[in-house]
């Protein structure tokens, strides 16, 4: 079962079966998985979530992810990224390869742009997306909120510079318009 598979990671680290099952259930519930389901009967996205759960349950200090949201539906993507964000918020260093710029915008704290095996840029999200030459060279398409922020700055809303989170952008506009 999914519960057995996820709990096995904790058992390997020396936890009792009860402790392992308790920890596994916490992660399984966050990912909205059926603990009694057979891993062999799951969709690709669900199998991906089980693999992540088996890793996350061990509370790693470093987590390396390669396209963790690839092929997932919107809700699966949100669940996975929420679990990853919780890990990061509790001190885990997360290194993620990702080509989905919306995911990058919502979850990354730093962006390293690699093109043809070479690092083009290493910096904040706003720094990278505001640098047109880097975006052009790496064929990066800035997410819509980046384009909106940059357009607002060009049209006199200087306080919108570098604001790529929806709430931050809305709040800056409210202040600028005295709302």
Language-model features: where?
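Conserved ABC ATPase signature
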Residues: 38-42
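Catalytic Walker B motif of ABC-type/P-loop ATPase nucleotide-binding domains
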Residues: 63-66
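A short, surface-exposed alpha-helical micro-motif characterized by mixed small hydrophobic
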Residues: 104-106
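H-loop/switch region of ABC-family ATPase nucleotide-binding domains
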Residues: 98-99
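Conserved catalytic motifs of ABC-family nucleotide-binding domains
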Residues: 59
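Hydrophobic anchor residue at the start of the ABC signature
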Residues: 52
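Conserved ABC ATPase "signature" C-loop
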Residues: 116-117
């Amino acid at each position: 079962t999914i519960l057995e598979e996820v709990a096995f990671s904790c058992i390997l680290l020396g936890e009792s079966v009860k402790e392992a099952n308790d920890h596994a259930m916490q992660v399984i519930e966050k990912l909205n998985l059926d603990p009694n389901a057979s891993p062999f009967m799951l969709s690709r996205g669900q199998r991906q979530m089980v693999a992540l759960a088996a890793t996350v349950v061990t509370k790693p200090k470093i987590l390396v992810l390669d396209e963790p949201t690839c092929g997932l539906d919107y809700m699966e993507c949100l669940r996975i990224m929420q679990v990853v964000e919780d890990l990061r918020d509790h001190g885990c260093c997360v290194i993620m390869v990702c080509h989905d710029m919306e995911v990058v915008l919502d979850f990354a704290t730093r962006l390293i742009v690699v093109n043809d095996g070479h690092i083009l840029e290493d910096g904040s999200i706003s720094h990278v997306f505001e640098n047109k030459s880097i975006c052009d060279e790496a064929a990066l398409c800035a997410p819509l909120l980046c384009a909106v922020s940059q357009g607002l700055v060009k049209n006199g809303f200087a306080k919108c510079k570098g604001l790529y989170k929806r709430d931050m952008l809305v709040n800056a506009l409210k202040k600028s318009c005295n709302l």
